[in-house]
């Protein structure tokens, strides 16, 4: 099916399925903004497979309102087969580009109305930043760095934005694969993690390894970058007012899963046993993120909560 049959009605800043409701109390000098609950999902490494179809079905049944694509979609020269699979959630999808998208990346850019491989948008009090791990030209890499720095600086100083979610394809942090392969993207780790710390990023979503991994809240370790600093050692999966982002790998969209080697100490949980997606509910008037990895087999494989008191 040609992508021309699709109609993209997704606005970068204002989403049709989300509304701000302002309640202005009579005789009051203050306006109280009430944020309706909303949710978003994320997955990467899809492929045109029955497993990918099951992931979309899982997302539809959950009723996701936004789908963050973490790269590697059709694994083919054309995007068409993946577009067929995600048709039920196409108008809710915002992508980042992966290495497996290869020669088809200009097609993805055109389909999703992108002028560059990095961009940002807002939904209520949540700021989303999509980045590229596939830029080859040094000038393009510098442009992205400047964009990210300026974007995060602006957002972190905006009192209307309580949450920052960053997403891209290759991982800043990951366990070794079975056999010892290290798929860490050093640029994402050493160049960008310090910025994520500085500007109070809450969650970093990534893929590339075809499995699921979740870290503790982490700060960058200048002395030993391979071993980030655990900001919190909480084991009850409930975090309040974080001072470092949680890195989540969701390479479980549908392409063949990868086994792990040894789990790194900075990871809370990892699994390669099921396909699925990360669902995040933004609730309690935008003050709480409740995240669950929803396996396509109907189980909740992992869950965690982040709350903010301000």
Could you describe each region identified by the protein language model?
Residues 1-31:
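Secretory targeting signatures
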Residues 26-81, 174-175:
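N-terminal active-site segment of His-dependent metallophosphoesterases
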Residues 37, 64, 159-163, 288:
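A general structural motif
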Residues 40, 67, 128, 164-165:
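Hydrophobic beta-strand anchors of alpha/beta hydrolase catalytic cores
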Residues 43-46, 71-73, 99-100, 133-134, ...:
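Active-site metal-binding loops of divalent metal-dependent hydrolases
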Residues 67-73, 167-170, 195-209, 282:
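Conserved beta-strand->loop/alpha-helix structural units within folded catalytic cores of enzymes
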Residues 78-164, 178-192, 197, 203, ...:
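Extended active-site neighborhood of metal-dependent phosphoesterases/phosphodiesterases
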Residues 256-310:
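A short C-terminal boundary segment appended to hydrolase-like catalytic domains
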């Amino acid at each position: 099916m040609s992508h021309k049959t699709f109609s993209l009605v997704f606005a970068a800043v204002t989403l049709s399925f989300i509304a701000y409701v302002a309640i202005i109390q009579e005789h009051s000098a203050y306006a109280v903004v009430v944020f309706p609950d909303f949710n978003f999902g994320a997955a990467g490494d899809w492929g045109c497979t029955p497993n990918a179809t099951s992931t979309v079905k899982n997302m539809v049944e959950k009723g996701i309102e936004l789908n963050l694509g973490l790269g590697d979609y059709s694994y083919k020269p054309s995007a068409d087969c993946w577009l067929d699979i995600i048709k039920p959630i196409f108008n809710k999808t915002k992508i980042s580009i992966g290495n497996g998208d290869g020669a088809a990346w200009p097609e993805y850019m055109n389909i999703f109305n992108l002028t560059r491989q990095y961009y940002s948008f807002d939904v209520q009090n949540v700021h989303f930043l999509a980045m590229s791990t596939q830029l080859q030209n040094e000038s393009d890499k510098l442009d992205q760095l400047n964009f990210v720095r300026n974007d995060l600086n602006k957002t972190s100083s905006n009192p209307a934005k309580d949450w920052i979610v960053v997403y891209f394809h290759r991982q800043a942090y990951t366990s070794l694969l079975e056999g010892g392969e290290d798929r860490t993207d050093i640029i994402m780790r050493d160049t960008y993690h310090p910025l994520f710390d500085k500007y109070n990023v809450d969650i970093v979503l990534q893929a590339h390894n075809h499995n699921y991994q979740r870290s503790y809240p982490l700060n960058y370790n200048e002395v030993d970058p391979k071993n980030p600093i655990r900001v919190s050692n909480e084991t009850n999966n409930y975090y309040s007012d974080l001072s470092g982002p949680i890195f989540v790998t969701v390479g479980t969209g549908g392409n063949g899963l990868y086994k792990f080697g040894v789990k790194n100490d900075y990871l809370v949980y990892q699994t390669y046993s099921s396909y699925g997606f990360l669902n995040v509910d933004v609730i309690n008037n935008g003050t709480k993120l409740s995240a669950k990895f929803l396996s396509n087999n109907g189980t909740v494989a992992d869950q965690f909560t982040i709350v903010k008191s301000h």
